[in-house]
Amino acid sequence: MSATLGCALRLEEFSDFVQEVRGHRPFPWQTAYLQRVAESGIWPDLDIPTGLGKTSVIDAWCFLLAWQHSTGAERTVPVRLYFVVDRRLVVDQAHESARDLQQSLHDSGPTTVTGRVARALRELGGSDTALESVRMRGGVDWSSRWVRSPAQPAVISSTVDQYGSRLLFRGYHSSPRMRPIDAALCGMDALLVVDEAHIALPLLRTASDCAAYQATASHPVLASRAVQVVSLSATASACADRPRHSITDADRTHPVAGRRLNAQRRLTLLDASSNAKDTTTAFAQAATLAVDALLQVIERPVLGVVANTIRSARAAHHLLAQRADVDVVLLTGRSRSLDRERLLAHPLVAELLAGVRPDRAKPLVVVATQTVEVGIDISFAGLVTENASLAALVQRLGRLDRTGDLALAPAIVLRSNVQRDESTIPVYGGAAERTWAHLVEHAPVVEMAGLDVPALSGKLTEGLLVNPLTLPALLTDVDTSALNVAEPLIPVVHRTLIDAWARTSPAPVPDQEPAPFLHGLDTSPEDVLVLWRADLREIDGQPDFDQWATCMRQTPPHGAETVAIPARQLRRFLTRSAGADDTSDLEGTPSSSEAVPAGRRQPPPAMSPALRYDEREGQWVPVTVPRDLRPGSTVVLPARYGGHDAFGWTGTRNQPVTDLGDFPSTDTTPTRLDAHVLALLTTGDGVHIGRLSAAVSRATRRLRDEDPVETTGIVTELLDTLLNPAHPHDGPYADLAHTRLNRLRSVEQWSTAPAGRTEKHGHVVLDAADPSRLVLIPPRPPRGKRERTPGVADDAADASSLTRPVPLPQHSVAVAERASAFASALNLPPQLVAALRTAGHAHDCGKEHSRFQCMLCAGDRLLSETLDEPRAKSGMDPADHHGRRRAAQLAQWHPDMRHEAISALAVTAWLDSRPEHLRGDDDDLLVHLVAAHHGHARPLLPAVADPAPEKVTCTMPDHQEVIVDSADMGTDWAGPDRFHALNSRYGPWGLALLEATLRLADMACSEEGT
């Protein structure tokens, strides 16, 4: 239902909206873009110079979505906007912009333009939240469900790999059963905005091809909802005939935009490549000299040093950080998000982001990688940049005097590599060399040999003027393709591929990897997610893999403790292979291939062992040879290996890495009291591990030996001991440990009872194999508050059966109504709304199997047989993995048996009776939605028969009782043909959207305990 027409928004109010949200009026091009989209319904690509606010496309989308709803017009504006950048960012400006917009909408008064926009968005999404802002990152738990409703307006910032793999039904670091939901949300009702599209051209074309295939669906509504694609680059489009939107004279003469377009950036070349044996050292030394030269002439005390690789950036930072006359900060994108958040809170970084004061006592030098090229709103007064491709240099120059206020903004392009072949120069190859050769024809060149600071400083005022208005003349009649990284070979997306990708359960073998369709054929393998744990033990120098896996099940990983690393670099790190680490903050870049010895086949090099999460099997498995480090997987390393510090990935084995496994975003997840973990958190070293271990061991011994009524006192005493000032708390992460221990100290009751935690008391888990280790699980949140539990995936056998005990009839009605509400908010046709409502009623009727009910009663058969109503939810603690497995064993419910298989049998039998119940007009869709509501049946349910078949009585939506035989729950031979027909009818992403609508409704009701 649209907002009342009296509150209808007008396009002319966009300027007031931007003023209220951002504190300034939009530039002329921004207003013109909004009008153009509103009139045509088409989102043109943007050809806008850096510094003129291209991220404002988020504001335009938000306003247009609300405007269209408030006027009662048929919605054509997508409900989700994906802002994609193909690099690792230390600051995600698009996400920060979306978060500020979200907050403004939340805080706005009802009579303001922003308040009216917020009201329209709430009505449209059927939610109390006007807008969600989400960072898309992978995970192996429920945190990967990044949108709660398919109708929720949302801005999602992402990398190419994270968005693209999800679009293609193969989400990296995502549960296989979650992939259809991810694909639906990425491929339907979505606007894909790609920044720096010249390095993400494969994604542009792949997404456009996917949209074209979805448009062939025979269902007209779902055919029209395919993803729409927008490029924010002047040199890249999904196809040659795409409309483009550019600046006009109104922008050139604008008092603010015009000044930015005329910024006085002067470019000088510094050649440090002669006789450079170690190019990294040569870059660091030359960068230090260049910094000194810039300090002589800059008008504000802040300058940047941008390197092409993390290794070079760290080398320059190492030299500059030893000086007392400057403040230095290092920014790289490949770091754990929790480390990144702490770095952004550092006073120097906070000052940089707020704007450096001109009267600052010491100059601030920012050493960085490609991570500052986009996504961060900073302005340097001077710049040193390693030579790179033309596009990269233009982006880096865009960080120099962004406001155009300085009379002189000098930049030094530094070359320390000379090309001998395409692989000599890391990241950019021959494009960097050709760009240098072109610049030499126009800009002054200074040789490093014999150079001193005054000589270089004197050249800076003579540099080449480079800004958005002079750049076109500099590139007249120039083939810029030679100055940039070559366009990759992009494979064609065809229907056979899409049909194969849509088959997510089971996936085809062999399966087509999505990487070539996201980065091109001639690119390196995609990343792996890496995390470190300090409680992974060895026995006689050998890894105890069983203990490792147990620890990971007990405290599953979360997104804030992971970092994405190229698979080849992780192999090099674990095998201690020779050769420089050329890791950059770009994704999917071409790289030199890993060396393969000539002659006969060599055995794999010795490798430090690790642990990998097998998404297909849902288990942690050992990794002992390099080939098992598979791109796209999640890998756990012992903290003692090193490889990461407060700034991010180091690629070196120097210091142990702090274990951040106990600090996800929720406060109710398990916390390990382990001496090795606590020592790294509180002191940064292992000096007092013995004292910590002794304290925990004493408490563990008492918990085993003394009366359970003493449990709370013992745990409280242990926490007091750990919080005692006698234990050092001066480590870099001591505040995290101190805050968590204090929060646990506030828990009033603790118990070691097998039943686990409740809303009133926390649960203490003892480690039978290690007396110096225990785990504390805080009480569950009060009724009505949601909880997402790491490690409980949607594809677990009883995942939908967790949380509080809920009767099956109550849950079925709740899911039916929620699915219907979601479908109505999506403006789906009445027949599809009816189908989703009916599927919601029937989806869990297979849980009436007696052994499944026994499992939901923790294995208590007597209790299950005396229930007044069958259960949908067990009431078991989601964090109690052992308890869940024990309940299934006691009930003799095989972990691969699926209750939805029985539900599908019951729905099929019910439909055979031709019920008069309102259910839509597609019975095949109804059966599929029920069968697929945990991500299976795409196209097959697991072929697992009931070893002890029984008759199951299922209650259907019209209260008719249907009896089915669980012996029939094996292979559904009609499934593949039904799945193929439904994909043709609704499109691959359209069918996935219908599934997602039901599944998200089920998950929401499960979390809420309704």
Region spans (language model):
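Conserved strand-helix element at the start of the C-terminal RecA-like helicase core
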Residues: R80-A94, L294-A321, L330
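Divalent metal-dependent catalytic cores for phosphoryl transfer on phosphate-bearing substrates
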Residues: V427-W436, V440, D798-P805, S824-T1010
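Conserved Walker A/P-loop ATP-binding site and its immediately adjacent core
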Residues: R75-Q103, D107-R116, D161-S165, A200, ...
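Conserved pre-motif I regulatory segment
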Residues: S2-I48
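Interdomain hinge/linker at the junction between the two RecA-like core domains of SF2 helicases
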Residues: P220-Q228, L232-V297
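Inter-Walker segment of RecA-like/P-loop motor cores
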Residues: H106-R177
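Walker A/P-loop
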Residues: G41-W61
